[in-house]
Regions:
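Hydrophobic/aromatic-rich transmembrane helices and adjacent perimembrane loops
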Residues: 147-148, 154-157, 206, 309, ...
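Membrane-interface transmembrane helices that cradle and orient dolichyl/undecaprenyl
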Residues: 1, 164-189, 197
Length: 557
């Protein structure tokens, strides 16, 4: 393929990837008449896990400014590697204390992964067409778009691993070049990417297995050419990977209890029959691609397969084509990354835990697409010699088949747009899955008068956060910028449980926001503040209990 055409197509693919990952990622701060419209922000609200990341990022900004630096691990919410939160902290410096600042980092990694899969596929298969097809299929993948728009650290894993593998195969394919300077640079870069991957997601820890095929090829090449320093390049790669992973490794040595997180709690080894559970989980994860996807509204349209049915066909054909062509890395990658999913026993099928399977799935899909269309076009091309008088007709048929291929790729994007923006994003279940009114409550508190005491009441006893606060408060804490104790006092905001309502002081004025169990909470509050009125804020559509009516609220006794 012409290099200029290839570059132009790659640019179109990256623009497409950017559209699907960035469009409508900004947040609409108010809603109309208490009902969610087609949201200006997709996803709406902020999931507690995202908010916890944001609160840690806010905390990290403070330590960064005081010169204490960033943490490599955050123990809240079962523990998370710190790189993503630290990058989100840098994003907050640019975009402020917003949900966009948290999610734009995911979008950026999602876009970079599209570039990485193009580079890797081109290097591994040595086929420009297959590489471009892999790029456009990933750019328009509902599965990948979903996690490119949520502020979860796991989105980094596909990028770091794909980019790291690209670097090794790039080096291997150019060992005979006259100059090795650029190969040293790529080895350094690839090693850093591979090492940083350990900061992305716990499932990444199995990734070293994927280095074995290419390291073996490099070893064989080095044995043949003993006078060269071929072995130096993978040595540089591995050394840089080791250096990049050292801070996290040292943390785990000092804090071994954090190494497994909650893995042991959800492991199949806690089940009565682990082997049976493992087999069932493998079946569910494979089935997720074809007929029964993730049932969590946060990750998917419940039950919708992770692959659109034509892409599922391409994937199946491509998987066997990869084996036929001895592309052993692809089945190894899929097998290795299905293991972390299969040994867990919670919420399967689980598209988030399977996130590192995404690149090889779409490489297979690209292989299958190219094999099907190139074979059919090739067959008609061969007929030109047999039926010379039908040459024009046969060329028209070939062009039509090629056009059909383009239509299928465009349709994949249209299907994702329809599924994500028109079917999934507008559902009230999605708003509920992303915290419902929690983020709006935080924005309301942030903009409320500081001189009035504001009480947020919850009856939740869920204390996942090591600070002892329920996780459902995290979106409120993030949006109101009150995760740290000092801002709470300055802004006159108090977070209490139902058992602590006797601490409420509402002699002159106050605002009380019950975030769950509305009727029991109001009943208990009436005993303390008899004249309390239930009001709805005009701008936010939130229910707020007030002792007296105020402008901007519609109240009832």
């Amino acid at each position: 393929m012409n290099k200029k055409l290839s570059f132009a197509l790659l640019l179109i693919i990256l623009v497409t990837a950017s559209f699907f990952r960035v469009w409508r990622l900004d947040y609409q701060q108010t809603r109309t008449q208490g009902a969610w419209p087609t949201p200006a922000s997709t996803p709406p609200g902020l999931f507690p896990d995202e908010a916890m990341n944001g609160n840690n990022a806010h905390e990290a900004l403070g330590t960064f400014r005081t010169g204490e630096g960033f943490r490599v691990f955050y123990r809240e919410n079962f523990g998370r590697e710190g790189l993503f939160m630290n990058l989100q902290a840098m994003s907050m410096l640019v975009f402020g204390h917003t949900s966009f600042a948290l999610r734009i980092m995911s979008a950026l990694f999602g876009i970079l992964t599209v570039l990485a899969i193009y580079l890797f596929t081109r290097e591994y298969t040595k086929n420009e067409y297959t590489a471009l097809i892999a790029g456009i299929l990933l750019a328009t993948s509902f599965w990948h778009v979903m996690f490119s728009r949520i502020g979860f650290r796991a989105i980094m894993a596909p990028f770091f691993l794909t980019a790291a593998l690209w670097a090794l195969y790039y080096v291997y394919n150019r060992l005979d070049s006259a100059s090795h300077t650029h190969l040293v640079i790529i080895s350094v870069l690839g090693g850093i990417f591979f090492g940083l991957g350990f900061y992305s997601y716990i499932a990444y820890r199995i990734a070293p297995l994927l280095l074995l095929p290419i390291l073996y090829l490099l070893y064989k090449k080095a044995k043949k050419e003993k006078d060269s320093c071929i072995i130096c390049l993978p040595a540089i790669y591995l050394f840089l990977a080791f250096l990049a992973a050292i801070p996290l490794g040292l943390y785990f040595v000092q804090n071994p209890q954090d190494f497994f997180g909650r893995t042991s709690q959800i492991s199949i080894f806690a089940q009565p029959n682990p082997l049976k559970s493992f087999a069932e989980n493998v079946g569910k994860t494979v089935g997720m691609l074809y007929y029964a996807g993730d049932f969590n509204w946060r990750h998917n349209i419940p039950g919708m397969p992770s692959l659109w049915w034509p892409v599922a066909i391409f994937f199946t054909v491509g998987f066997f084509d990869a084996i036929r062509k001895k592309y052993w890395l692809i089945p190894l990658w899929l097998t290795a990354m299905i293991l972390p999913v299969a040994i867990s026993s919670e919420g399967l099928p689980h598209s988030l835990r399977a996130i590192i399977m995404i690149p090889p799935v779409y490489v297979c899909a690209a292989l299958g697409f190219y094999l099907i269309f190139s074979s059919v076009i090739g067959w008609f091309k061969k007929q030109e010699k047999r039926f010379a008088d039908l040459e024009i007709l046969l060329k028209v048929i070939q062009a039509s088949i090629g056009t059909l291929g383009v239509v299928v790729l465009i349709s994949a994007g249209a299907n994702t747009y329809n599924s994500y923006f028109l079917r999934w994003a507008i559902r009230p279940e999605v708003a509920s899955a992303y915290g419902g009114d929690s983020y709006l409550t935080g924005l309301f508190l942030k903009n409320a008068p500081r001189d009035i005491p504001k009480y947020v009441i919850t009856s939740s006893v869920d204390s996942i956060d090591v600070t002892g606060r329920p996780m459902e408060l995290e979106p409120i804490l993030y949006a109101s910028e009150t995760y740290l104790p000092d801002p709470q006092g300055v802004k006159n905001i108090f977070y209490i449980t139902l058992k602590q309502i006797n601490t409420i002081e509402c002699k002159k004025d106050c605002m009380i926001i019950p975030i769950d169990n509305l009727q029991p909470t109001l009943g208990a509050l009436k005993k303390i503040v008899p004249d309390l009125k239930l009001c709805r804020a005009d701008d936010y559509g939130l229910l707020v209990a007030l002792p007296t009516a105020r402008p901007g609220f519609k109240c009832s006794s």
